Amino acid sequence: VLGDLIIADDDTIYTTDSLTGVLYRYSVSDKEFSVVVDSGTFVSPQGLVLDVGGKHLFVADYVGGLHCVRLADGRVERITSPDSINTYGIDGLYRHGNELVAIQNGIQPHRVVALALSDDGLSITGSRTLARNLPEFDEPTLGTIVGDSFYFVANSHWNSFDRNNNLPDGLSNPIILKLPL
């Protein structure tokens, strides 16, 4: 099941398979997929974002926290953080300068945080909570950064699907929220 994807400046597409844990690279010119990180490293890769130079890919593993993948050789390093900063349950991941903006819908209460990266990008040095436990939240997920603002879906209703993948009648319309960064 292909999940999140990101397009690099050279039009290479990176995407995750949230069921097998594989990270793929898709060459637009060759129209072919190749494996960057095979199954066994990630449990449920979700959010993806490139570093400023496009040489590393930050991967949010819903169960395993944050990782940094060196794109040249596929080497994976776990991003460390102080015990006081939780990096689990991240669904959406975005970059704003030297911060990773993360939607955490796998922990309670749901929240949106900005995680400050070290200069080498391999550790979290601090965090800011941008939004937490808002009344509009019903599985917040997916967003985008425009300038110094973060727009995201506050109520994906992801947990409302029944076992046949149907949504019940009467759900509220999607709510898009904007947060200053």
Locate predicted features.
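Active-site/pore-lining binding-face segments in mid-to-C-terminal subdomains
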Residues: 82, 90-128
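Short loop/turn segments that connect beta-strands within beta-propeller blades
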Residues: 27-31, 70-75, 116-121, 180-181
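Hydrophobic alpha-helical segments and helix pairs
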Residues: 1-33
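Beta-rich, blade/repeat-based domains predominating
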Residues: 1-14, 40-56, 60-64, 84-104, ...
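Beta-propeller blade signature
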Residues: 114-119, 166-181
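Short loop/turn segments immediately following the C-termini of beta-strands
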Residues: 18-20, 28, 61-63, 105-107, ...
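A short beta-strand motif characteristic of beta-propeller blades
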Residues: 32-39, 75-83, 125-133
